[in-house]
Curated annotation (Swiss-Prot):
A cellular component term, taken from the record's GO annotations: extracellular space
Subcellular location: Secreted; Cytoplasmic granule
Keywords: Antibiotic, Antimicrobial, Defensin, Disulfide bond, Secreted, Signal
Major site of localization recorded for this protein: secreted
Gene: GAL4
Protein name: Gallinacin-4
Tissue: Strong expression in the bone marrow and testis. Widely expressed. Weak expression in the ovarian stroma, but not expressed in the ovarian follicles.
Swiss-Prot/TrEMBL GO biological process terms: cell chemotaxis; defense response to bacterium; defense response to fungus; defense response to Gram-negative bacterium; defense response to Gram-positive bacterium
């Protein structure tokens, strides 16, 4: 009976981990603070590119 409880807990942990793994990874950064802004496409000339803030939007920094 103890081993049955152990397997139920193990199954719960495995399913719980699989649910978290199925989500897509987050590659987007938070932008819009301390001199940064989010703009569609590429950053305007004279601004530094920092990364993506959402799909097809660039996170830029004022220079």
């Amino acid at each position: 009976m103890k081993i049955l409880c152990f397997f139920i807990v193990l199954l719960f942990v495995a399913v719980h981990g699989a649910v978290g793994f199925s989500r897509s990874p987050r590659y987007h950064m938070q932008c819009g603070y301390r001199g940064t802004f989010c703009t569609p496409g590429k950053c305007p000339h004279g601004n530094a590119y920092l990364g993506l803030c959402r799909p097809k939007y660039s996170c830029c920094r004022w220079l």
